[in-house]
Design a protein with these regions (language model features):
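Mixed-charge, glycine-accented linear interaction segment located at domain edges/termini
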Residues: 110-157
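Generic preference for hydrophobic/aromatic residues in regular secondary structure cores
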Residues: 10-13, 30-31, 91-98, 115, ...
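Beta-strand secondary-structure signal
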Residues: 62-66, 95, 130-134
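Short, acidic/charged, Gly/Pro-enriched secondary-structure junctions
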Residues: 76-109
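Intrinsic disorder/low-complexity signal
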Residues: 17, 40, 47, 67, ...
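Solvent-exposed edge beta-strands and adjacent loop segments
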Residues: 1-70, 114-125
Length: 157
């Protein structure tokens, strides 16, 4: 048993490659990728009990993001394009895969997210972007995850 280091859980975004196929590319140079479950609660108090009861009825997962803008980064370029062009609907949806490299066999979960930009340029030293990825459906466990380039890109099944 041991502690899991943050850099052992890495994220990949599906970005269209030059051939038009989706390439799951590592999300690098992010200063924040915080997952929030956003539980949907149902609370009530029954007349015959002196306390409240709360049940979880669902979830509204999000990932809050922030990054320092780097040149020639395909994931950042894609997010910046969505932000600058104010894309909406399906044009602002991407698949994100979270890979856990702390296990003996890497495990991966994928989910579609809407990219919800929030702010940009709020640092005096470097140009930054931030926002949220909001769940657009259920998460799916991937049967396998492989990489031929030290986890710069991945293939999933």
């Amino acid at each position: 048993m041991g502690i899991v280091q943050r850099h052992k859980k890495i994220a990949f975004m599906g970005v269209k490659g030059e051939s038009g196929t989706i390439v799951y590319t590592r999300m690098q140079k992010f200063t924040s990728l915080t997952q929030n479950k956003n539980s949907i609660e149902y609370s009530r108090q029954y007349v015959d009990e002196p306390f409240n009861r709360t049940d979880v009825m669902g979830y509204g997962p999000t990932i809050d993001y922030a990054f320092d803008k780097h040149t020639a980064d395909t994931v950042q370029t894609d997010i910046i394009n969505i932000t600058d062009k104010e894309l909406m609907g399906d044009d602002a949806v991407r698949t994100i895969v979270i890979v856990d490299l702390s296990a003996a066999e890497p495990k991966a979960i994928k989910r579609d997210y809407s990219i919800i930009p929030s702010s940009e340029g709020d640092n005096i030293n470097v140009y930054t972007y931030s926002g949220s990825f909001k769940a657009r459906g259920a998460a799916e466990a991937c049967a396998s995850v492989t990489s031929n380039d030290e986890y710069q890109t991945i293939s999933i099944t």
